[in-house]
Amino acid sequence: MVHLSAEEKGHINAIWSKVSVDQTGAEALGRLLIVYPWTSRFFDHFGDLSSAKGVMGNAKVQGHGAKVLTSFGDAVKNMDNLKGTFAKLSELHCDKLHVDPENFRLLGNILVICLAEHFGKDFTPEVQAAWQKLVAGVATALAHKYH
């Protein structure tokens, strides 16, 4: 699994404490659906996702994005036990939803992009590296049930 130093954990917590879960979650999920449109097949019940404007203005995308990022907050709280933290979600996404585990990596990378955009100069290369490690760890934990 991922080992994060005390300094890296500090970088992650400093940014996370300023994150708007609703806004950033909606933005990250919306960008995923726009940039990787095949991911929308998991969200057929969300209505029209055929345009960027439709995706970003979709209340269900916004709500689920907030839910996803709230869950990601569990990773921030449990950085030393990502596998255990996401065991049930891994099982759900593997056994019931059949989500391609690559999608977890894609969403994690988009989250890092959103954070970089929101935090600008505070999102230094060191901060980005710490976040990349965390999102990679979360993606691995979510994909655990697939192995």
UniProtKB/Swiss-Prot annotation:
Residue ranges of domain Globin in the record: 3-147
Taxonomic superkingdom: Eukaryota
SUPFAM superfamilies, per the entry: Globin-like
Keywords associated with the record: Acetylation, Heme, Iron, Metal-binding, Oxygen transport, S-nitrosylation, Transport
GO terms assigned for molecular function: haptoglobin binding; heme binding; metal ion binding; organic acid binding; oxygen binding; oxygen carrier activity; peroxidase activity
Pfam families the UniProt entry points to: Globin
Residues involved in heme b binding: 64, 93
Record's keyword annotation contains Transcription regulation: no
InterPro entries, sorted: Globin (IPR000971), Globin-like_sf (IPR009050), Globin/Proto (IPR012292), Hemoglobin_b (IPR002337), Hemoglobin_oxygen_transport (IPR050056)
Positions where S-nitrosocysteine occurs in the chain: 94
Transmembrane domains' residue ranges: none
N-acetylvaline modifications at: 2
GO cellular component, one term: haptoglobin-hemoglobin complex
Tissue expression as described in the entry: Red blood cells.
GO-annotated biological processes: hydrogen peroxide catabolic process
Subunit structure, interactors included: Heterotetramer of two alpha chains and two beta chains.
Recorded family membership: Belongs to the globin family.
Cited PANTHER family: HEMOGLOBIN FAMILY MEMBER, HEMOGLOBIN SUBUNIT EPSILON
Function: Involved in oxygen transport from the lung to the various peripheral tissues.
Protein name, as recorded: Hemoglobin subunit beta
Organism listed in the record: Sminthopsis crassicaudata
